[in-house]
Amino acid sequence: MVEDSQETTHFGFQTVAKEQKQDMVAHVFHSVAAKYDVMNDLMSFGIHRLWKRFTIDCSGVRRGQTVLDLAGGTGDLTAKFSRLVGETGRVMLADINDSMLKMGREKLRNIGIVGNVEYVQANAEALPFADNTFDCITISFGLRNVTDKEKALRSMYRVLKPGGRLLVLEFSKPIIEPLSKAYDAYSFHILPKVGELVAKDGDSYRYLAESIRMHPDQETLKGMMQDAGFESVDYHNLTAGIVALHRGYKF
């Protein structure tokens, strides 16, 4: 029950007090961390790898640059960026959830990604970095879980260098109506059952499906990025808008 005097936000389809959402999201990701990569493949039929590859290709990251992989989870993007920036560059894998951060660290070290990667537990709304630190920031399937998205976008803008760019890869609104209906049926009826079967946690995957529906659509997120200060903001619809990649610059 939320008191009238409290500021509220959404947790999936629930209305909750703002100060409660962070802990509730944390519980979800503590629960799913161990099966996160397996479930990503099952949920997207492996297509998430193509979406992330496209994000890397659009990043413009070069040797010697400094990159922040925010809400980086198990480190898929960090692994790619580590190779791109080379020994003279640096990649920061940041996640608010220590279980996800631990999984990412173990996974990357097991495949030999060491030396130019650092790990930081950080809240996107109050990034613990100096102004003008990063050449590129990515946040992949993480923004929809942030309580105050506008505050997080302003925080990302602050720590970007002039000339730097932000890429937001996130589930969005399908642009083909029959696909939208089929996607809803899959998300709300099949996905929680797969989550229960594979990860023994149908409720967390029900939340993830609901959080996708509550996330701003393509044009709304574009406007939010512009309001945070980003310029030349554009987006690419991927898989007919099931996912969108937004990109904005700090000049």
From Swiss-Prot:
Keywords: Menaquinone biosynthesis, Methyltransferase, S-adenosyl-L-methionine, Transferase, Ubiquinone biosynthesis. The keyword Zinc does not apply. Pathway: Quinol/quinone metabolism; menaquinone biosynthesis; menaquinol from 1,4-dihydroxy-2-naphthoate: step 2/2; Cofactor biosynthesis; ubiquinone biosynthesis. Signal peptide: none annotated. The keyword Zinc-finger does not apply. Its EC number is 2.1.1.163, 2.1.1.201. InterPro entries: SAM-dependent_MTases_sf, UbiE/COQ5_MeTrFase, UbiE/COQ5_MeTrFase_CS. GO terms for biological process: aerobic respiration; menaquinone biosynthetic process; methylation. S-adenosyl-L-methionine binds at T74, D95, N123, A124, S140. It catalyses: a 2-demethylmenaquinol + S-adenosyl-L-methionine = a menaquinol + S-adenosyl-L-homocysteine + H(+); a 2-methoxy-6-(all-trans-polyprenyl)benzene-1,4-diol + S-adenosyl-L-methionine = a 5-methoxy-2-methyl-3-(all-trans-polyprenyl)benzene-1,4-diol + S-adenosyl-L-homocysteine + H(+). GO terms for molecular function: 2-methoxy-6-polyprenyl-1,4-benzoquinol methyltransferase activity; demethylmenaquinone methyltransferase activity. It comes from the Bacteria. Belongs to the class I-like SAM-binding methyltransferase superfamily. MenG/UbiE family. Methyltransferase required for the conversion of demethylmenaquinol (DMKH2) to menaquinol (MKH2) and the conversion of 2-polyprenyl-6-methoxy-1,4-benzoquinol (DDMQH2) to 2-polyprenyl-3-methyl-6-methoxy-1,4-benzoquinol (DMQH2). This is Ubiquinone/menaquinone biosynthesis C-methyltransferase UbiE. It comes from Klebsiella pneumoniae (strain 342).
